[in-house]
A protein has these predicted regions:
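Membrane-helix interface linkers and caps
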Residues: 1-11, 29-32, 65, 69
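Hydrophobic alpha-helical membrane-embedded or membrane-associated segments
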Residues: 12-20
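Transmembrane helix-loop-helix hairpins at the membrane interface
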Residues: 19-28, 37-130
Length: 130
């Protein structure tokens, strides 16, 4: 039985986001995120690795996979999935807003690198403030 394109899109988007979340949990168990005391490693993780990987996964893969749902729905879905993997309710709320902005940016430009730069800037500001 052939699935509808929208069902395939939902399953693919959820699968991609779940895979990213599980891979992150596995890596954290094997090698925990650098402690706040190790500023250089923490900086590299939060301001270089995380923004690049998250943009590739959520604005690259998930947004593209969700495309058959329509532009608005695809942006909303990837933003919700992005927010859910950010933990606390406050973190999720801000991540939802960022995910919406970064999703629209990726759709308008057709590229993920502008979002990578904006995401890196956001994380850098949070890192410096924290």
């Amino acid at each position: 039985m052939e699935q509808e394109p929208k069902t395939k899109a939902l399953l693919a988007a959820f699968g991609c986001a779940l895979g990213y979340l599980l891979a992150g949990k596995l890596l954290a168990a094997l090698r925990p995120v650098p402690a706040a005391g190790d500023r250089l490693l923490s900086f590299l993780y939060h301001c270089a690795a995380a923004p690049v990987l998250e943009e590739l996964v959520f604005r690259g893969a998930v947004l593209r996979m969700a495309g058959p749902l329509g532009e608005r729905n695809a942006v909303l879905l990837q933003a919700v999935l992005f927010a859910v993997q950010h933990g606390s309710p406050a973190g999720m709320a801000w991540a939802l807003v960022c995910g919406l902005v970064l999703g629209v940016l990726a759709q308008r430009t057709g590229r993920v690198w502008p979002g990578m730069l904006l995401h890196t800037l956001n994380n850098l500001l949070v890192f410096v403030a924290g």
